[in-house]
Regions:
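Conserved ABC ATPase "signature" region
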Residues: 133-151, 203
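Short helical segment in ABC ATPase nucleotide-binding domains corresponding to the A-loop/adjacent helical element
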Residues: 119-127, 136, 140, 249
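The feature captures the beta-strand-to-loop junction immediately N-terminal to the Walker
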Residues: 64-66
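Conserved signature/switch motifs of ABC ATPase nucleotide-binding domains
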Residues: 154-157, 175
Length: 284
């Protein structure tokens, strides 16, 4: 079992002093001149074009950009759920050519099976061939990590949205992925639960330091959670395709103070890059 438990009210993101910080175990992700186009009745539409970025092993990279710019498509390409029409994607130096077991994804909706308990839903994420005893131990470990031990035998309809999302996160981690892909995982939650889930993600990453790629519409969330922030931009209004505009390094070490001047300055910089007045709220 892990040497810490997480409750919904825990606001700390630091490991206890007597627990060693684990080394990053995530895989580096390299995207080289990646493009993704779709064909339809209106002709060909490029969503991503000439996208080149290196995601470091064990880092949290947040992806922000205007609605419809291809953020979710980027996640699907990294995870092998969607094939690029140009370029190449590798995880830990090996090409991604199909649905890739080295990656796991969690969506905005928990997508839990309603007739199974939370523990049984988490169990579905275990790699094939996992022994019964090892599987039970891993599920118990993950439920403790996300603060759901006491709710393990409840069904999804019996728990809150935040608890269901924690179970979804645990299920994604059950595979032991080198890369964890998060597609606006907290977007449907209320403001307070969202803040708690942000802290929980940092706690989980401290214990299981896989590479994380997080898509979010919330600039403040991106800066609070990520090591770096990838800003996508639309290349041309005519075709709407997107590529990398900038990659920014988040200020200071985590946990970050949202009230610090450096945090506020970078938030304003990102919002300006997105074409948003800096006096507006951060969620886009």
């Amino acid at each position: 079992m892990v040497g810490m438990s997480v409750t919904a009210l825990d606001r700390s993101v630091a490991l206890p002093a007597d627990v060693d910080q684990p080394a990053p175990r995530g895989g580096a992700v390299d995207l080289v001149e990646v493009g993704r186009a779709f064909s339809g009745t209106g002709g060909r539409r490029d969503v991503l074009r000439d996208l080149t970025v290196q995601i470091r092993a064990g880092e949290i990279l947040a992806v922000v950009g205007p609605s419809g710019c291809g953020k979710s498509t980027l996640l699907r390409v990294i995870g092998g759920l969607d094939r690029p029409t140009a370029g190449a994607v590798t995880v830990a130096g090996q090409p991604v050519v199909d649905t890739d077991a080295r990656t796991a994804i969690a969506f905005q909706e928990p997508r839990l099976l309603p007739w199974r308990t939370l523990a049984q839903n988490v169990e579905l994420g275990l790699p094939q061939g996992t022994g019964r005893r090892a599987g039970r131990a891993r599920v118990a470990e993950l439920l403790e990590l996300v603060g759901l031990t006491a709710s393990a035998d409840l069904n999804p309809r019996q728990v809150s949205g935040g608890m269901a999302q924690r179970a979804s996160l645990a299920r994604a981690l059950a595979r032991g992925p080198e890369v964890l892909l998060l597609d606006e995982p907290f977007g449907a939650l209320d403001a307070l639960t969202r803040l708690r889930m942000q802290d929980l993600l940092l706690q989980v990453h401290a214990v299981e330091p896989t590479t994380v790629v997080l898509v979010t519409h919330d600039v403040e969330e991106a800066l609070f959670l990520a090591d770096r922030v990838l800003l996508l931009r639309t290349l041309t209004p005519e075709d709407g395709s997107s590529s990398v505009a900038r990659i920014l390094t988040a200020p200071g070490e985590r946990p970050r103070d949202r009230a610090e001047a450096a945090f506020a300055d970078l938030r304003a910089d990102l919002l300006t890059g997105l074409g948003v007045d800096t006096h507006h709220a951060s969620p886009l």
